[in-house]
Amino acid sequence: MKITVHSSKAVKPEYGACGVAPGCTADVVPLTVLDKANFDTYISVIYAFHPPAPPNAVLEAGLGRALVDYREWAGRLGVDANGDRAILLNDAGARFVEATADVALDSVMPLKPTSEVLSLHPSGDDGPEELMLIQVTRFACGSLVVGFTAQHLVSDGRATSNFFLAWSQATRGVAVDPVPVHDRASFFHPREPLHVEYEHRGVEFKPYEKAHDVVCGADGDEDEVVVNKVHFSREFISKLKAQASAGAPRPCSTLQCVVAHLWRSMTMARGLDGGETTSVAIAVDGRARMSPQVPDGYTGNVILWARPTTTAGELVDRPVKHAVELISREVARINDGYFKSFIDFANSGAVEKERLVATADAADMVLSPNIEVDSWLRIPFYDMDFGGGRPFFFMPSYLPVEGLLILLPSFLGDGSVDAYVPLFSRDMNTFKNCCYSLD
């Protein structure tokens, strides 16, 4: 598969006759404490569409209209008058790349999570600090692949997906839904007096001097990180739920069951000592958990992490139900009180005084003995439609971070789940042998 780039340009908000942003009241949007707690990195995803697809000029025009409603993505990161990190609403533009492939898309489908897919989207290093970079690639058969690369400090997965949806709606000429909510100042005020109920040191924050203690694997083929896509059918998930929910007052969720199962399988594959501590960090969306609720259209980050922890021996020797109980308890703990405790701590002055930094560190390339989970199961990726139909395939880009687990709904649309599992190559055969076992 040879990808040829034909053009690359900055697309700016298209305001039309008015020439200014409607309802614009600020040129700088300070990052919230929840934005700053997230990963300072770019995340890339890939969509595939069957023909027909609108011409590139139509997609570009739709992008310009969508950026009127989402000026953040046409801006740049900088600082505000107080020296705090902020999004500068300078309308510098989002990157728009046009490319072609020399093969029919069917010949390379399904796309595999290898370095080859990196050619289907821009890199975050490609532009002059652009926050959103998009590549549209036309295949020889007429199929279209759209690759997005977005700065995670600007928004979480749900908010970024809302922008993708808005672009498709603007391209079709329909109203943007959900309506974006840009007010980052009103939702996350600290309480008076501050009330820090939970420990946030060592959870969301770590000392600065540990920020660059990156663990790397040794050289050699066995220490290469490879990403394996695992497909869990609806039937497998039903059996897993029945096993994990036995005797419980209500069935456990698909997310909890699949994460518990993969946590155990990955721990077995790694061959951890039974007394070694292992945890799984699960991203928890606070929109519906906070009171008052944060609107679905909120454009920033509203994510903290549940961190169930146990020993490797306890995890693998006890049934999956035990792991589900650990996960359920910790996820439930990340409630309104926890979010507000975090906000109070982040505004208490302790972060600056103690020189703390976010534990969400994109430089960490090896997470063992731990796991981190990004669940995209409830994000409506398959609702995106430029006018030629919804995508028939979606995937994250190649991201070889050992232990970073990404879950998403299968494109089959039948309730099955796809999991992207990065492990050292030396551990992958063992993982493949146990990941479909319910023993």
Swiss-Prot record:
The keyword Acyltransferase applies. It comes from Hordeum vulgare (Barley). Belongs to the plant acyltransferase family. Pfam families: Transferase (PF02458). Keywords: Acyltransferase, Transferase. Its EC number is 2.3.1.64. The keyword Transferase applies. Optimum pH is 7.5. Monomer. Involved in the synthesis of hordatines (antifungal hydroxycinnamoylagmatine derivatives). Specific for agmatine as the acyl acceptor, inactive towards tyramine and putrescine. Has activity with the acyl donors 4-coumaroyl-CoA, cinnamoyl-CoA, caffeoyl-CoA, feruloyl-CoA, and to a lesser extent sinapoyl-CoA. It comes from the Eukaryota. Gene3D superfamilies: Chloramphenicol acetyltransferase-like domain. The active site is at residues 152, 385. One of its GO terms (molecular function) is agmatine N4-coumaroyltransferase activity. The gene is ACT-2. It is an enzyme of class 2 (transferase). This is Agmatine coumaroyltransferase-2. It catalyses: 4-coumaroyl-CoA + agmatine = N-(4-guanidinobutyl)-4-hydroxycinnamamide + CoA + H(+). PANTHER family: AGMATINE HYDROXYCINNAMOYLTRANSFERASE 1, TRICHOTHECENE 3-O-ACETYLTRANSFERASE.
